[in-house]
């Protein structure tokens, strides 16, 4: 212990920050005089009211005392994990008490499964957290404020299963984040938002998800205007997603959607370099009908991962190959397992070989290959015409040796 106690404060504080809870950090004060006040300067504070099944009244008083006794001038991370009996007044007081330490990261997670009533975050969140760089909220309720919100330093924002006052509040909240670069949104049911509008010029990374519990609704969806976006991840089982004014810097996109007209969305991300695509059942036919003769050309696309969970995926692939002249790498995988019958045969006989197959395609990986007649035709087509092909890896769906032999 003497050797450890002799280490510099900076290193000891870093070690204490790795402990899972402030309560564990405070216990170290009994180790020696060297440690007696060290806990008051730890830059990362994690308060978990479910930790060691502590009675909430004791937990609340512990948070009050530890914040009151804190010595260090700054807090890097303030993290609350709250559940049953969490009081709205407590959250308000804790945010105000900690605001004098200019904390840069605030995380509030509410366990709604045990909470008797929704935890409403205080108005002070918008007025006393101007130094925040990262804000992560989970299963909380935001309230409207009369004065404009402002997060001048906020770069990272995560809103998971959060409930809002309405559409206009979301617009106001995001417009107040002038340097926001990373946004995560996971919509829950009854979140009071029909159209979730994301119009942030500085945004570089965007993750949009809708809860599986939300019923598909053609009247609800996302509107995105993010000209600086480089990374997009969208998982949406209904509604719409409109991209306004393009995203010329988009490098990577993960798209798993169920849209009636997905080609309108795909035509908005044609600048992407790497694309993971899963069009859920009933979307692919619509996509193919719209994609040609209205041609979707991905001029910068070098890698595609295509999910084979729908029986029309082969025809979608044919469209993508024709519209991706610089494609280098192709991966096929069944991620969602929706397919219950063999893939439909190609409607396009591919009599004209796509440019990428002739001049750029180098690698093909096929996971869960079933060896159907249509799939064999595709393999033969690529092997016969792939002038630049260097590697073709096939992983059969079946592990049975006899079935594997039949696939050849």
From Swiss-Prot:
Domain F-box as annotated: residue spans: 1-54
Annotated S-S bridges: none
InterPro entries: F-box-like_dom_sf, F-box_dom, FBD, FBL13/AtMIF1-like, LRR_dom_sf, LRR_FXL15/At3g58940/PEG3-like
Domain FBD: 345-408
Protein's name according to its UniProt entry: Putative FBD-associated F-box protein At5g50270
Species per Swiss-Prot/TrEMBL record: Arabidopsis thaliana
